[in-house]
């Protein structure tokens, strides 16, 4: 039998969207009980890419993100679009770039570092963050409404059978449906 914990909100995934949602919920109502699960061993463990980030979203969450030490350190200094050809390359003039390729005011970041920082901020606001737990199943009530999620079992053999250290997954149930 699975153990169960109850929350007002359960968020599956500790990427930028899940973390931003958890943070915003706690900023709006500090009393709300928010849980975030992440399949990786730590927040940011499964996010390996770099990115160019527009700081608008993080500014909306944390207007003083620079003073708080957010890892947005390298401002984009110039834009360049290069087409590689069989015999070399051709630079496209910057004025010909579509606006979606222009990155003035943006930052070159490690998305994993940003997620780790957001995870720290979420925990400081009172979000219960559980790394190392994958969401395995959506749980429904008798009317077909979502009532929570179940995490995956731990200690399974390679055939998917319970092994000697088997622990059933947890039910993370919603208090208000």
Residue ranges and their predicted role:
Residues 40-87:
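N-terminal FAD cofactor-binding segment of flavoenzymes
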Residues 175-177:
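Conserved small/polar residues in nucleotide/adenosyl-binding loops
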Residues 132-145:
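A conserved short coil-to-beta-strand element within the FAD-binding core of flavoproteins
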Residues 100, 151-173:
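A structured beta-alpha segment of the ubiquitous adenosine-cofactor-binding alpha/beta core
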Residues 101-120:
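Short beta-strand to alpha-helix junction loop
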Residues 26-47:
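Glycine-rich FAD pyrophosphate-binding loop
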Residues 1-6, 166-169:
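A short, basic/flexible loop-to-alpha-helix module at the beginning of a structural domain
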Residues 9-33:
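N-terminal Rossmann-like FAD-binding beta1-loop-alpha1 element of flavoenzymes
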